[in-house]
Each structure stands twice: as structure tokens, then as C-alpha cells.
Amino acid sequence: NADPGFFDYILCKLAPSLARISTKMKGRAMCEVYGAFGWATGIPGIYDFDLEEQAPHIVFTPYIKALAAELTEGVTDPMEKARRFYDFITKNMSYTFMPSYFLLENIPDTCACNYNGDCGVFALLFLTLCRCAGIPAQWQSGLAVEPDFIGCHDWVRFYVEPYGWMFVDASYGVSSMRAGNEERRQFYFGN
């Protein structure tokens, strides 16, 4: 068994070097590091934590479990389950700016009950529903860049065989729905 302190030390020492490596290479390097510690599920790029709760924000509460079950009743195909989660969010939610997440409790439950949130809140709800349904999902964060705007943005990627990792941007899906652009809303699922 590896010493966790050694692992933390190595990651701290590697971080500056990894920052200079392309995003793809950095992802591969981290997968190899994590995989070397036995955290891999057997599918390349998927780890146990891609299916687990991660308190305080990714929690399978009774409400989330019931919502996931209701939305996927009679469905066995993981892609269709993910599609139903996306449709629920994009067809029902409204975009609202949120305070800092550390001030919020139970973000996915609150979003599902109040029908509003921002990009990160929608991402957390989609991610939590996917994981609750046994679909590996990972948080993604970066910048949204437009000709006259640059800002932080969050989305999710989820894994379904045989397609591999696919992206979902529920926030842009919500905006597309509100604008009446169904083709664009569909685009933000799986692309």
C-alpha cells in the first residue's frame, strides 16, 4: 500500500509540470497516477468516484433517488436515462445567478425542488442523477468564450458504452429551450 502523504507530495511536485502539459496529456497522466493506486473501475478513464456520492454537494438523498427512479421508470438503457435527466432539467428549469456554492446546502435537491439554478447547479443536478442511476459522470469546468464575453462555466461529461465519454451542457440547453431553439437544445446533449 502506498503512503497517502507520498501521493500528496508527488502531486504537489508534479502540479507545476503538469500545468505546462496539454489538457489531454494532463488527463492521461492523472489517470495513470490514479490507476496506479488501484482506483480504476476497469474502464479506461472511469474511476470509482465517478459513480459515488461526494458530500456535501453530490448526495443521493431520498428525493434524488425518487426523482431518478421516476424519470427513468421502465428504462434500462443508460443513454435514455441520461437523456431523460437532461430533458427534465432543460425543459423545466430557469437560469438564476446563485451565491457561492459553499453557502448553499444540498444543491441538487434545491435545484430539483425550486426549478432554478446556474450552470454549476444544473451540472450538479445532472451529475448526481446520473451517478444515482449508475451512470459514471464527471464535473467539468472552464471558460465560456464569446466575442464580447469571457466567464466561468460548468458542464458534465458522462460515460455510456459503446459511445464513451459524452458532454452535456444543461445550462446552454436551458437557454436554448427558453429561446425556442430545439435544435440547439438537442445539440448540448452528447456533443
Predicted regions and their residues:
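Acidic low-complexity segments
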Residues: 2-109, 113
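Active-site nucleophilic cysteine motif
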Residues: 78-85, 115-130
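Active-site rim elements
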Residues: 113-115, 143
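Hydrophobic/aromatic-rich core segments of domains that either
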Residues: 121-191
